[in-house]
């Protein structure tokens, strides 16, 4: 394996390579790859976001962040269907992300929740044939981030036109990328057969719908609660529910990692913010994220970017308080939602004699 190939590896694999290296030279190469990979990703992310916000106005920054995450993922992870149906799935994603912010303009909350549920369910069904590959978490985050980041007053005809152009351009780019990287995979796997004929009642598909319903409920709830950053609670909720229902990760372990990671991240931010400007702390967090391979440490350094933005609005004590409270709230809501859902599923199965 040469140096360029090592830069393409995940941090978890790179750390394995470092431990298993047969020589100091090989170990040094993998260590350099780990840190340079993180640096290149951060630099590319900064350039990527600057270009998009320059060409399409700064209001499109949430879309720039999401499109960057999609680009990083699509290079390595497909949607699990034959290429023509994967491109259809990509179109569903782009359309849903275009429409999602405008749902908040609907006056009737129940109708808004129903539309969010349909859009998010469609995204999950189209991209997460194998939820363990992480697409459910990525696109669930993307949906939440865009919906929460775009207030009503930013939504107008000009914004819609620009967003449509932006998403169409990236739809074309990502379609080419999907074709080049994944056209030989899953040649006989149909999106429509998988959803409507084979697996509609599978446990994974049921949990996709459960997850989409919970997220939709939480999005609509923001209209009725006084919290400043309900988006953070939404991310914590999403992480707990998606990891449990779609990736078979124990919610207790994920909840502990989320809360401890948030607490450590906030403490570190308080200390570092005494010496480093907020903007640089966000970049530092991005660099650290690039070398993390566990959820807990990713949660720690995710705090840096989020707090760097919020601290400029509420001050460091206020931002830290909101961050801790919202994460604990999201984790508690996620655990409660899983508990209630499990009880309902068990009762339904008992009623229909499906315990076996």
Where are the regions that the model predicts?
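Alpha-helical transmembrane segments and their membrane-interface boundaries
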Residues: 1-139, 143-296, 300-304, 309-356
């Amino acid at each position: 394996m040469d140096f360029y190939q090592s830069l393409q590896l995940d941090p978890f694999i790179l750390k394995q390579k470092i431990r298993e290296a047969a020589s100091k030279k090989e170990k040094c190469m993998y260590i350099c790859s780990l840190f340079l990979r993180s640096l290149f990703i951060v630099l590319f992310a900064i350039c990527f976001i600057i270009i998009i916000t320059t060409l399409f106005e700064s209001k499109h920054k949430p879309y720039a962040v999401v499109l960057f995450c999609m680009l990083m993922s699509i290079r390595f992870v497909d949607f699990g269907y034959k290429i023509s149906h994967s491109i259809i799935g990509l179109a569903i994603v782009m359309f849903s992300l275009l429409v999602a912010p405008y749902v908040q303009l609907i006056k009737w909350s129940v109708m808004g929740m129903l539309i969010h549920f349909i859009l998010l369910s469609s995204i999950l069904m189209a991209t997460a044939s194998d939820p363990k590959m992480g697409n459910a978490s990525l696109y669930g985050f993307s949906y939440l981030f865009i919906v929460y980041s775009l207030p009503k007053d930013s939504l107008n005809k000009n914004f819609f036109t620009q967003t449509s152009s932006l998403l169409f351009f990236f739809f074309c780019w990502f379609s080419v990328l999907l074709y080049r990287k994944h056209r030989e995979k899953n040649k006989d796997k149909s999106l429509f057969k998988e959803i409507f004929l084979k697996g509609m009642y599978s446990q994974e598909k049921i949990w996709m719908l459960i997850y989409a319903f919970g997220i939709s409920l939480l999005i609509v709830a923001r209209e009725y609660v006084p919290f400043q950053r309900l988006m953070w609670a939404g991310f914590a909720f999403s992480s707990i529910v998606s990891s449990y229902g779609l990736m078979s990760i124990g919610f207790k372990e994920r909840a502990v990692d989320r809360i401890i990671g948030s607490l450590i991240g906030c403490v570190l931010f308080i200390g570092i913010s005494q010496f480093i400007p907020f903007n640089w702390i966000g970049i530092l967090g991005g660099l650290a994220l690039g070398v993390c391979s566990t959820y807990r440490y990713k949660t720690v350094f995710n705090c840096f970017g989020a707090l760097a933005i919020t601290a400029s609005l509420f001050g460091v004590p206020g931002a830290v308080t909101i961050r801790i409270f919202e994460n604990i709230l999201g984790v508690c809501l996620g655990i409660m939602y899983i508990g209630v859902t499990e009880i309902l599923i068990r009762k339904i199965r008992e009623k229909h004699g499906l315990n076996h």
